C-alpha cells in the first residue's frame, strides 16, 4: 500500500446533478449511431440499473455535469461495437469538468459496475483519469483510475479518518488508445467493506475488509467531479447492477 498525491459530431443530453454546476447542452447535430445494436449484458449478479451502448445517440438516463471547456457527449469517433460511445473531454483550463452518473435505487446494498474504456489523451503528471467512482451521498469513497505519471491502475479508498489509502493494482502501464474492460463490485460496510476489481477479465483485487467511511452507496460516476482533471476518455457497453441484500 502506498500513498501518492494525487469531436467528431457529438450530442449530449445533460441533466442537473445535485451539488455541482450543470449546464444543459443542446445538440447542434445528431450523431449517426446504430440503435439496433444489442444491449450489453454480463454475468455479474444483480438487477440491471443501467445497460447502455450509447447507440441511442444521447446520454439520457444519466445525471450529466459539465463546466468550462469540459464536454460529456456521444461520439462516433471511437466505439467498441456499434457506431457510438460516450465521450468525456476535460482540459487543464480552470473550471473544466465532465462526468455522468448512474443513480442507484434506494436500499442498494451492493453494486456491480462493468464497462469498456479507451483513454486517448492522458492528463497532467501527478493527476489521474478516472474509470469508476462510487459515492455515498456527496462523498466519494472508492474509485479506480489510471495514474498519469506511470499509467498504472490504482484503487483509492476514503478511510473513516478522512485520509485516502492507495493500492496499486497493476505494475505495468494501462495502454492508451486501446479498449480495456474494468469491472468492480462494492459492498459498503464501513471497516468491513467489500471491494473487488477486474481488469480485462482478470481479478486484480479482492478484499472484504476494506476500511471505508461509507455504509451506503447511492451512485456510480464516470469522469471526475472536480475541475482540471484533464483527459479524453471513451466509454462503451456500460452496465450497472445492484443488489438489495
Task: Please provide the spans of the model-predicted regions.
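Secreted extracellular polysaccharide-interacting domains
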Residues: 85-112, 163-169
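Glycan-recognition/cleft segments
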Residues: 129-157
Amino acid at each position: 500500500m502506498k500513498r501518492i498525491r494525487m469531436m467528431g459530431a457529438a450530442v449530449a443530453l445533460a441533466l442537473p446533478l445535485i451539488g455541482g454546476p450543470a449546464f444543459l447542452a443542446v445538440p447542434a447535430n445528431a450523431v449517426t449511431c446504430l440503435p439496433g445494436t444489442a444491449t450489453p449484458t454480463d454475468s455479474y449478479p444483480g438487477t440491471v440499473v443501467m445497460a447502455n451502448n450509447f447507440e441511442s445517440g444521447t446520454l439520457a438516463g444519466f445525471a450529466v455535469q459539465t463546466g468550462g471547456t469540459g464536454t460529456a457527449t456521444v461520439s462516433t469517433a471511437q466505439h467498441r461495437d456499434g457506431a457510438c460511445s460516450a465521450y468525456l473531454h476535460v482540459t487543464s483550463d480552470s473550471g473544466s469538468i465532465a462526468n455522468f452518473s448512474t443513480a442507484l435505487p434506494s436500499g442498494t446494498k451492493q453494486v456491480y459496475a462493468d464497462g469498456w474504456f479507451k483513454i486517448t489523451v492522458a492528463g497532467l503528471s501527478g493527476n489521474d483519469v478516472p474509470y469508476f467512482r462510487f459515492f455515498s451521498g456527496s462523498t466519494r469513497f472508492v474509485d479506480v483510475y489510471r495514474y498519469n505519471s506511470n499509467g498504472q491502475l490504482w484503487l483509492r479508498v476514503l478511510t473513516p479518518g478522512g485520509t485516502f489509502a492507495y493500492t496499486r493494482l497493476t505494475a505495468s502501464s494501462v495502454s492508451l488508445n486501446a479498449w480495456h474492460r474494468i469491472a468492480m463490485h462494492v459492498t459498503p460496510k464501513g471497516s468491513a467493506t467489500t471491494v473487488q476489481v477486474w481488469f480485462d477479465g482478470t481479478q486484480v483485487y479482492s478484499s472484504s475488509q476494506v476500511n471505508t467511511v461509507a455504509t451506503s452507496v447511492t451512485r456510480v460516476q464516470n469522469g471526475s467531479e472536480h475541475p482540471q482533471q484533464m483527459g479524453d476518455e471513451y466509454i462503451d457497453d456500460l452496465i450497472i447492477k445492484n443488489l438489495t441484500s
